[in-house]
């Protein structure tokens, strides 16, 4: 009516932000043997022990879809099986919820879980995730890369 142009609001799109974060993290851990499966980065060590990094977004229905957590897990097949005679062949990959040992970024180093606000600068989030992965998660994954090491550390 008056010729004023209405500025279009920039919509926040959490999946696109998580895609960017996940791509950067994957580029850093791919040389270490991780493969991408949806929102999960997975690798096998010692043949069949899974090590998992998973990106979890909040739920829109709860109003926290702008938040993200990084889940960390290790799956030891013998601890996941429900019978003494395993019949299922090894899967191509496992998810964080399949893991025997589970935690979140932040808790790995004995602090509170790290929650990321996806409305903040993406490059800052990526730097923090990579920093925590390199300083705390990957060293733990290196230590807990065999059944013997997992049992030894669990006894401590």
What are these regions (language model features)?
Residues 2-20, 24, 36, 43-156:
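Intrinsically disordered, low-complexity regulatory regions enriched in serine/threonine/proline
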Residues 29:
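Pyridoxal 5′-phosphate
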């Amino acid at each position: 009516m008056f010729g004023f142009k209405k500025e279009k609001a920039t919509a926040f799109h959490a999946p696109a932000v998580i895609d960017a974060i996940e791509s950067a993290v994957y580029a850093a851990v791919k040389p270490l043997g991780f493969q991408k499966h949806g929102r999960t980065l997975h690798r096998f060590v010692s043949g069949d022990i899974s090590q998992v990094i998973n990106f979890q977004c909040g739920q829109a229905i709860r109003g926290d879809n702008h938040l993200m957590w990084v889940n960390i897990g290790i799956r030891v097949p013998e601890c996941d099986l429900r019978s003494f005679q395993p019949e299922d062949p090894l899967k191509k990959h496992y998810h964080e919820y399949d893991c025997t040992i589970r935690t979140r970024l932040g808790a790995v180093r004995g602090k509170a879980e790290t929650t990321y606000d996806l409305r903040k600068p993406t490059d800052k989030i990526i730097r923090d995730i990579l920093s925590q992965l390199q300083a705390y998660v990957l060293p733990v994954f290196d230590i807990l890369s065999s059944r013997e090491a997992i049992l030894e550390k669990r006894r401590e």
